[in-house]
Design a protein with these regions (language model features):
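Gly/Thr-rich phosphate-binding beta-strand-loop-beta motif of the actin/hexokinase/Hsp70
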Residues: 1-38, 70-77, 133, 181-230, ...
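Adenine-nucleotide phosphate-binding core of ATP-dependent small-molecule kinases
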Residues: 224, 245-294, 301
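Phosphate/pyrophosphate-binding loops at sites that engage ATP/ADP/AMP, CoA/4′-phosphopantetheine
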Residues: 58-71, 157, 240, 277-294
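Glycine-rich phosphate-binding loops at beta-strand->alpha-helix junctions
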Residues: 290-320, 324-326
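Non-catalytic, solvent-exposed interaction/assembly segments
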Residues: 1-107, 148-150, 156, 160, ...
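Active-site neighborhood for divalent-cation/phosphate handling
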Residues: 71, 76-184, 294, 324-331
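Glycine-rich phosphate-binding loop plus the immediately following alpha-helix
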Residues: 42-46, 145-173, 179-181, 215-258
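Glycine-rich phosphate-binding/hydrolytic loop that grips phosphoryl groups
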Residues: 170-173, 228, 302, 320-340
Length: 340
């Protein structure tokens, strides 16, 4: 049982285990510990033993860090669960839970006894005299068997998880807190004249999450492209082992022929731009009054030279690498190169 106000956030990724511990100091969130444990092989490599690699990483985490008496929050891929948003009719707030349960039966394609689910009224919802008028509700669910599967590595290692959250929603929460808090706290949401939206692209190892939000509303999509696709392109065209291709990708500018490396990866650059364009286009078809003003990109792959500029040039958007947090303190952690 956690006895402090500190929280560990843990992600079991395809390439590494990542963990960040934060605590509250008054109203300030302070990062006070961080760990990044890269696996000897990526979990998706054919010869890898994922369960063994993750178990070894968790043992290292426990040896190097104090996780007792802290809450543990685990992020899981967006495709592990379901997130849907709907606009309920005007209803008494005290009856909203019953309305949401009815909606859950319609929206969740499984028996509710087989899922873990919850809901949240989104910021900007209008509540007057005990009635929710103009509102939007987020509905979130995961199959119980999927929850058990995600928890299994930590259960086996004796790490007790207090909270599970799908990664795209965690990203939204970060944006809402770190960059849009003044808007959410001080502005009234107008569905006919919504505030500008931000796109955040989180590039993972085998897939990427794209989130579009104005702070009050959220739209998300998982894209079947990640950092490994660049590596595989090099493996295929340059006849390299996966390990050598990964090293070349990470050190492209120091290669014997950098131009050849980037030309080889260009098809994946183009595929990524196409996927982003398709996602933004679909979002705009559903939200005709939305105005997108910037694209933030995150993940280790964004360190690859030229990627951010290439995406921005082809999309016609201002692109920024998400390499800092406005409302997170703790220089001892924030200055660590592995964290950045």
């Amino acid at each position: 049982m956690a006895s402090s106000n500190g929280v560990w956030g843990i992600e079991i990724g395809q390439a590494a285990l990542k963990a960040l511990r934060c605590h509250l100091d008054g109203d300030t969130i302070v990062a006070d510990a961080f760990d990044y444990i890269e696996y000897p092989k990526m979990l998706s490599q054919p010869e890898a033993e994922p369960a063994e690699l993750v178990a070894e990483a968790l043992e290292k985490f426990k040896e190097r860090n104090d996780s007792r008496n802290f809450k543990i929050c685990m992020s899981v891929p967006g495709q592990s669960g379901l997130a849907k948003f709907f606009k309920p009719p005007p209803v008494e707030v005290k009856k909203l839970a019953d309305l949401v349960r009815y909606e859950a039966r319609q929206q969740i394609p499984f028996d509710l006894d087989d899922v873990v689910w919850d809901y949240q009224m989104m910021p900007g919802s209008t509540v007057e005299d005990g009635y929710a008028l103009e509102s939007e509700v987020g509905l979130f669910a995961m199959k119980r068997e999927m929850v058990a599967r995600q928890l299994q590595p930590l259960d086996r290692s004796g790490v007790e998880v207090d909270l599970i959250q799908m990664a795209p929603l965690a990203i939204y929460n970060m944006l809402a807190y770190d960059r849009m808090h003044e808007r959410i706290e001080n502005e009234t949401f107008n569905v006919d004249s919504p505030p500008t939206s931000t796109v955040l692209l989180s590039i993972g190892t085998d897939s990427s999450d794209l989130i579009i939000t104005n702070g009050f509303r959220i739209w998300q999509r998982s894209m079947p492209l990640g950092g490994n696709h660049f590596t595989r392109q090099l493996t295929k065209d340059l006849k390299l082992t996966f390990a050598k291709a990964e090293h070349l990708k990470r050190n492209a500018r120091e290669a014997v022929d950098p131009k050849l490396v980037f030309q080889t990866m260009r098809p994946v650059f183009n595929d990524m731009v196409t996927e982003i364009q398709r996602s933004i286009g679909f979002f705009r078809s559903l939200n005709k009054k939305a105005e997108i003003t910037e694209l933030l990109i995150a993940g280790n792959t964004v360190k690859m030279p030229g990627l951010a500029g290439y995406i921005g040039k082809n999309l016609g958007l201002e692109v920024h690498v998400l390499d800092r947090f406005n409302r997170l303190s703790g220089d001892d952690v924030l200055s660590v190169p592995a964290f950045r």
